[in-house]
From Swiss-Prot:
Ranges annotated as spanning the membrane: 7-29, 41-61, 67-87, 93-113, 126-146, 147-167, 187-207, 217-237, 248-266, 272-291
Lineage of the organism: Eukaryota, Metazoa, Chordata, Craniata, Vertebrata
Name of this chain's protein: UDP-N-acetylglucosamine transporter TMEM241 homolog
Protein family: Belongs to the nucleotide-sugar transporter family. SLC35A subfamily.
GO biological process, any: UDP-N-acetylglucosamine transmembrane transport
Membrane-topology annotation of the record: Multi-pass membrane protein
Compartments reported by the entry: Golgi apparatus, cis-Golgi network membrane
Organism per entry: Xenopus laevis (African clawed frog)
Length: 296
């Protein structure tokens, strides 16, 4: 694997770890399980910071083309599906289990790419897809903390992630940059999640949240919004400064560090079969990075 750009890569890993730990703390420890509000808040904070950075000239955003914005709206809908379903899944599943299921999104994107773009894949990538599918498929059979709702939302999440990757790849010819797309995602998410907060019952239920006036909740929510934006920005910088293979390598490292440390800080019941499933998922992603690098 290539790990050039250590400063950018390590910064990305730090924000990745901090963001997931903060989200897990708010969702699972404090049990603030109202995704329209939590994700709406995160996208609002991210959108405001991104807008301010744009206005003061720190970042460049160009969303003047209405046709490009309209063409990107399906991506916005998939983005909302990713963060909403991901929030509900992460609140119920341990981080290593969530990552293993999340990685299975490669199976979805691989299927669509074969169907739509007729892409030929090297045998090593096919093997990695097999490992990712096998590990994700065996997880519910060997998870002593099996949660049906958590797995259901994880499946929705991974499907949206896979479709988002394919859709993003199909829009490469457009004039929207990664930051442009993310800015539109933020605006769309704030509006849609805000409108959905009352019909889903989250707005009323949140008024009875036991930690509503506690500083731990306030600081956790503020940190989650800021860290989410910083993680997004670090990811964009990583993609722009390094190759796609190097970006995938750092993403893999960030997941390994986050999943490993989560075993210390968050509750998880590890058994031998579950551990083998998690290791198979990690091996599958490592082989996928290797396949992207070598092309064989």
């Amino acid at each position: 694997m290539y790990f050039r750009g250590p400063a950018v890569g390590l910064t990305f890993c730090c924000f990745y770890l901090s963001s997931y730990f903060t989200n897990k703390y708010v969702l699972s420890v404090l049990k603030f399980t109202y995704p329209t509000l939590f994700q709406g808040w995160q996208t609002l904070v991210g959108g405001l910071i991104l807008h301010i950075c744009w206005k003061v000239g720190w970042l460049e955003i160009n969303c003047n083309s209405r046709s490009d914005v309209v063409l990107w709206l399906p991506g916005c809908a998939l983005f909302v599906g990713i963060i909403y379903a991901g929030s509900r899944a992460l609140s119920r599943l341990p981080i290593p289990v969530f990552f293993t299921l999340h990685n299975a999104a490669e199976v979805v994107s691989y299927g669509f790419q074969r169907l739509l773009f007729r892409e030929k894949c090297p045998y090593s990538k096919i093997f990695s897809i097999f490992l990712l599918l096998l590990s994700a498929g065996c997880l519910p059979l060997h998870d002593p903390q099996f949660d049906a709702d958590g797995y259901f939302w994880a499946v929705i999440h991974l499907f949206c992630v896979g479709c988002y990757k394919v859709f993003k790849k199909s829009q490469k010819s457009g004039s929207l940059s990664d930051l442009d797309q993310q800015y539109i995602n933020y605006v769309f998410s704030v509006v849609l999640l805000g409108l959905a907060s009352h019909p889903t019952g989250d707005l009323i239920s949140a008024l009875e949240f036991p930690f509503l006036y506690f500083y731990r909740f306030h600081s956790g929510c503020c940190a989650s919004g800021i860290l989410g934006f910083l993680l997004m920005l670090a990811s964009v910088k990583l993609r722009s400064n390094l190759s796609s293979v190097q970006h995938a390598s750092w993403n893999f490292v960030a997941k390994v560090i986050t999943a490993g440390l989560s075993l210390i800080y968050f509750q998880i019941t590890l058994t031998v079969p579950l551990t083998l499933c998690l290791l198979a998922g990690g091996l599958g992603e490592a082989v996928l990075v290797y396949a992207e690098r070598t092309g064989v």
